[in-house]
Amino acid sequence: MPSNESTCLGSDRNMQTAWKLNASTPGFTPKKLRVVCIGAGLSGLTLAYKLKHERPMDFVDLRIYEKNHEVGGTWLDNVYPGVGCDIPSPSYVFPFEPNPDWSKFYVGGAEIQQYILRTTAKYGLKERIVFNTRLLKAEWNEDSAKWKLQLEQDGRVFDDETDVLINGTGCLSQWKWPDIEGLDCFKGKLLHSARWDPEYNWEGKRIAVIGNGSSALQLVPSLQPKAAKLVNYIRHPTWVSVNFCPDLTRDGMGSNFEFTEEEKQQFRDDPEMFFQYRKKVEHGVNTVLQMMISGSGEHKFLHETVEGLMRQRLADRPDLIDKMIPNYEIGCRRLSPGDGYLEALQAANARPSFANINRITPTGFETDEGEEEFDLIACATGFNTSYIPPFKMTGRGGRRLDVEWKDKPAAYFATCAAGFPNYFIFAGPNAPIGHGSVNRMIWFQADYMLNWVEKIATEDIRSVAVKDSAVRDFNEFAKENLKRFVWSKGCHAWYSKKTDGEDNIVTAMYPGSLLHFKVYLDKIRGEHFDIQYNTSNMFGFLGNGELALEREKDGDMAFYM
């Protein structure tokens, strides 16, 4: 009968060694594996913790390469005035290190970075990290079944290799300048929100802020009070929402509040009470998804509430209401809480501008409304959201990720890419980043990756690569199910991509809930992968038919009871 086994490049048995029974080796004896993770932000640190403390595997040699001088990722890079997290702080933690000492319900970026540094030191997570090192390219070598890596450290280029490669750089790590003529000609100070200069004194300056996404909504009210003037240039209006989980705030309306010293002491003294409080917050964060279902009662309530609040906050400037309130469904762009943002734009020294920026001059802007001079241009213009890694990736058979994902990224449950063996991604395309805490998503993905690492090591596997058919079918499911959600409703947002012959395809959001994502990743689901073994017999890893513990002096011969 005809075979239905894979005939892809690399499945050739010439790559394997002939199998011969080894009567001295117990079954499931793990082989040594080298695992390299790129990035020491939340993802890399979670992986480091699991391998050192929660799931130690003495057969794994972990190395983490970090381009910066310190851990932290997003929270190391983003230091602009007002930077903070709009997810409630009790939920924005490493799951293994709840923090009873948060100062507020929604905390600033500096406090989050200090928490990351403190946690890293407490658990000794730096020992596997190499700093100031950038991955330039990764190429799969079929003969050795390893990733060949080229890296750069302080101007020196060197090579490395690994059995398993993990991308922990995140989807919002490659910031970008706006595509405006004359950007390089500006003689004043030019900053990006993701590359802010904390030494620069912006007080008393004439400031232009380009953009009105999440960063701009934090930046504008922080700069406005001490600016000589501030103009916020806006291409598309955005919903300025209340903070997440408003019902858990003091006033029930999402206003931030400080935890009292008595509350923090109670959190420290009563772990069970603190756990129940954190669970209540986590529950609230996870219910946000229902508000993202187009036409749902929860979505209608959110729309009416936020529109009413925006009209109320703009009551003194009725001329701005139609310009500032969008006509697309709320949530189509990322919900952007903006305490003080609308108020700042109504101050005497500030205003929004909807004029098109034709070009940047040495002294400021030339727009449809004329010329205007500035001392500082602050670009809150976002990131490269193509999901193409910041390094060149060449997989099996010469497949290139930058080519295959040029128009539309397509992954397997935000974690694997077809044609790229032994390669895993944190927060890849179609990840559940639209609600819930990203820390939990990373936790679930890390377990899934380590399940594969353990399987590869203990079953003498040469390579695992998700099938093209699995990626195709998952993305077809995602495309259809995401039509239920507001993210697909045609607004201008980084969540989606416009491709030839197709409507907007949502590439950033998972087609379901974080809970749904977690349950799916609880199992490896190897039927969706091409698995190749090191020997010609796929059951070679069974060894001599015994377990190692059976020959140990105090081996538990009834461990299953």
Swiss-Prot record:
Question: Which positions are annotated as binding FAD?
Answer: T74, W75, L76, D77, D86, I87, Y92
Q: Which domain of life is it from?
A: Eukaryota
Kindly tell me the pathway this chain contributes to: Secondary metabolite biosynthesis
Enzyme Commission code(s) on record: 1.14.13.-
Cofactor(s), by name: FAD
Transition state stabilizer, annotated site positions: R334
- One Gene Ontology molecular-function label: flavin adenine dinucleotide binding
Full protein name: FAD-binding monooxygenase tazF
Q: What does this protein do?
A: FAD-binding monooxygenase; part of the gene cluster that mediates the biosynthesis of azaterrilone A and other azaphilones, a class of fungal metabolites characterized by a highly oxygenated pyrano-quinone bicyclic core and exhibiting a broad range of bioactivities. The first step of the pathway begins with the non-reducing polyketide synthase tazA that assembles one acetyl-CoA starter unit, five malonyl-CoA units, and catalyzes a series of Claisen condensations, methylation, PT-mediated cyclization, and finally releases the first hexaketide precursor through the R-domain.
What keywords does the record list, in alphabetical order? FAD, Flavoprotein, Monooxygenase, NADP, Oxidoreductase
Q: Kindly give the Pfam families that the UniProt entry links to this protein.
A: FMO-like
- Enumerate the InterPro entries for this protein: FAD-bind_Monooxygenase_sf, FAD/NAD-bd_sf, Flavin_mOase-like
What top-level class of enzyme does the UniProt entry assign? oxidoreductase
This chain's source organism reads: Aspergillus terreus (strain NIH 2624 / FGSC A1156)
Q: Family per UniProt?
A: Belongs to the FAD-binding monooxygenase family.
- What does the UniProt cofactor note say? Binds 1 FAD per subunit.
Ligand binding (NADP(+)) = G84, C85, D86, N212, G213, S214, S215, A216, L217, Q218, R235, H236
Gene induction: Expression is positively regulated by the azaterrilone A cluster-specific transcription factor tazR.
